[in-house]
């Protein structure tokens, strides 16, 4: 016997899905790199696309910027999200939007355009951090918007990004909770990805974990990529 979900139930599920996407974008802002960038919340907003899902994701990113970032970095982060949403809305009906590289490049360029004004008279290390965060943003967006990425894989990617927020949390100063979770999630993800893709995902995760502290040190990039 088949049961059909009534229309109010479908609407409720749709509303909950949209609110969940907005909440995810908000919480992902806690995964900060260098205390200045939150590329994975922008990647989730880029994956949401234009229209109502994109608008609610924009609100989620803005809320996360207020909660988890200082005022100036949060303002730039929210501005990048606005620019990203505007670009996706402007091109959503074109052939260009359907190209696999469009959303990853648009997300990275939105962040770079906003941040570059602030970085004009900053040291080279700040530029390197911004470029690295933008590269991670493009990579995460590409994985989330790829046609071959299953919902389970996307869930593991989101879980790995959320684990970055727990990297500073340690148990009796012995090990990082976020790093332990990140390694476990990468092991699960590597079983469902080709070896090269799994290695790249591990390297990106290690690089992101290295950049979480305000004084980054590249220690885990190679380890997680192996």
Which residue ranges define each predicted feature?
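Membrane-embedded alpha-helical hairpins and interfacial helices in multi-pass inner-membrane proteins
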Residues: 2-226
């Amino acid at each position: 016997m088949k049961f059909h979900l009534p229309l109010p139930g479908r609407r409720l599920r749709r509303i909950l899905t949209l609110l969940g996407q907005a909440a995810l974008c908000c919480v992902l802002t806690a995964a900060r790199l260098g205390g200045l960038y939150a590329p994975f919340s922008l990647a989730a907003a880029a994956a949401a696309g234009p229209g109502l899902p994109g608008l609610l994701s924009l609100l989620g990113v803005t809320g996360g910027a207020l909660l988890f970032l200082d005022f100036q970095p949060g303002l730039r982060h929210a501005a990048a999200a606005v620019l990203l949403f505007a670009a996706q809305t402007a091109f959503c009906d074109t052939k260009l939007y359907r190209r696999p590289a469009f959303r990853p490049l648009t997300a990275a360029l939105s962040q770079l355009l906003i941040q570059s004004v602030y970085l004009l008279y900053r040291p080279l290390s700040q530029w390197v951090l911004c470029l690295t965060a933008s590269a991670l943003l493009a990579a995460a967006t590409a994985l989330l918007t790829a046609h071959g990425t299953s919902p389970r894989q996307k869930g593991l990617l989101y879980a790995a990004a959320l684990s970055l927020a727990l990297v500073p949390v340690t148990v009796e100063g012995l090990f990082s909770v976020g790093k332990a979770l990140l390694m476990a999630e990468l092991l699960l993800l590597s079983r469902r990805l080709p070896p090269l893709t799994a290695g790249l995902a591990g390297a990106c995760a290690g690089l992101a974990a290295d950049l979480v502290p305000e004084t980054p040190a590249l220690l885990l990039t190679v380890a997680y990529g192996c």
